[in-house]
């Protein structure tokens, strides 16, 4: 049986790879205009050192003009069986109207953002998204999940 890879087509997005030899299984998608030098600099700088952790911005509303989302395999081994388990990890970097970057590795936040852009498209300078960063309680007492939602 063959595995079929499926993806979601998202408008305003460009697939990005920095894997020169083509062996990486990591995937990245950005809505930044990589023909615009200023946005290229935003993209590169955020890869090395984002301005803010999105987790520290709960309760804030951000006007987002760009985003980079990533998906990469994370390999672990079941200690009891020795079975190799590969799960997908996600990253999300948002860029505001002032060029500041906000990063998270929260899977819940990634999926909340993916749900938004599936219907609205990725944010751009011409079509920004106004997003509110929220923390919602988890079933486990004392734990919260980070999410983004459309700001009112």
Positions of PLM-derived features:
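A composition-driven signal for long, intrinsically disordered, charge-rich low-complexity tracts
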Residues: 25, 106-108, 128
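GIY-YIG-like beta-to-alpha core
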Residues: 102-115
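Short nucleic-acid-contacting surface segments enriched for D/E, G, S/T with interspersed K/R
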Residues: 57, 112-132
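OB-fold ssDNA-binding interfaces and closely related basic DNA-contact patches used
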Residues: 1-99, 141-143, 150-152
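Short, charged beta-turn/beta-strand-edge "cap" motif at the junction between a beta-strand
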Residues: 123-125, 132-152
């Amino acid at each position: 049986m063959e595995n079929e890879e499926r993806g979601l087509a998202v408008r305003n997005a460009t697939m990005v790879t920095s894997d020169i030899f083509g062996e990486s299984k990591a995937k990245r998608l950005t809505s930044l205009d990589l023909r615009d030098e200023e946005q290229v600099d935003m993209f590169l700088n955020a890869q090395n050192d984002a301005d803010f952790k999105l987790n520290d911005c709960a309760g804030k509303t951000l006007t987002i003009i760009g985003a980079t989302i990533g998906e990469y395999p994370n390999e672990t081994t079941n200690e009891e069986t020795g079975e190799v388990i590969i799960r997908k990890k996600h990253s999300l970097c948002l860029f505001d109207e002032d060029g500041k970057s906000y990063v998270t590795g929260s899977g819940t936040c990634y999926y909340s953002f993916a749900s938004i852009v599936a219907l609205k498209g990725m944010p751009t300078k011409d079509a920004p998204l106004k997003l509110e960063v929220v923390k919602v309680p988890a079933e486990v007492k004392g734990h919260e999940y980070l999410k983004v939602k459309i700001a009112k």
